[in-house]
Amino acid sequence: RKAIALGLDPILAICIATKHAADHYGFQRRGSIEPNLLANLIVFDDLNNFRVRQTWYHGKLVATNGVMNALCTSELDWSTANDSVHLPKLTEQSFCVKGKTELIRVIGLIEGQLITEELHERAKIEQGKCVADANRDILKMAVIERHHGTNNIGLGFVKGFSFQHGAIASTVGHDAHNVAVVGDNDADMLVAAQTLNPQGGQCVVSDGRVLAHLPLPIAGLMSDEPSEFVIDKQQAVLEAIHILGCPLDDPFMPLSFLPLSVIPKLKLSDLGLVDVEQFQIVPLEV
């Protein structure tokens, strides 16, 4: 409406908003009215006010003059949304990081920000394995692919959570929303990951015991319970991680962005550590 009011030809304005946009983003079956394209159409009264008269979806009239067609029913299959956490068979060995290197890359949290630092820290080696060092606030992190059964597990280390004797896990991890786990020992990391299979959500584990769990059964992202239930469970999760010594107000917020490998500097995906500035997978060893 604004473009036409400013003098742009109506046909060109419609092309820019439909066909040009579809072509730009590679939507091959959308953007124009042609054979073999999706019959998703909007019928306007005129080319000035653009008041919508009819809406067609997949060749069916679904709304007229702003009113939904009473016969229009959802064809969505919600079963997959309630069955979205599919973890591989996990053991403590799944979280093992072999190595004898002196220096490793560590993700450094910056409180209140989504960006991270790339820290180079001295590795703690025990029996040929690189392990967490909670006394120096260097915890182990894992990102486990949960959608397609790839068995991918990315492993790394992170500094800034500052808790001991436990692990946290979440299925909220932008943008792929895999299972992200942080802990100071492999046993608790295993329990935390298994706790989220298949209900998803967020949890806190210590000494093999689940201290708190907020289930998020819808795609691992949302709850089907009343808001009061969600608030109580979320508060219990936060209280539990604070008991373990974490000073962050809500550690699940930075955790949810650590797998997001488009925000600098160092992130962890299910394929491994990502140097976002270089857009490359990088090794743990420096």
Please report, for each region that a protein language model flagged, where it lies by residue.
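Active-site microenvironment of metallo-dependent hydrolases
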Residues: R1-V286
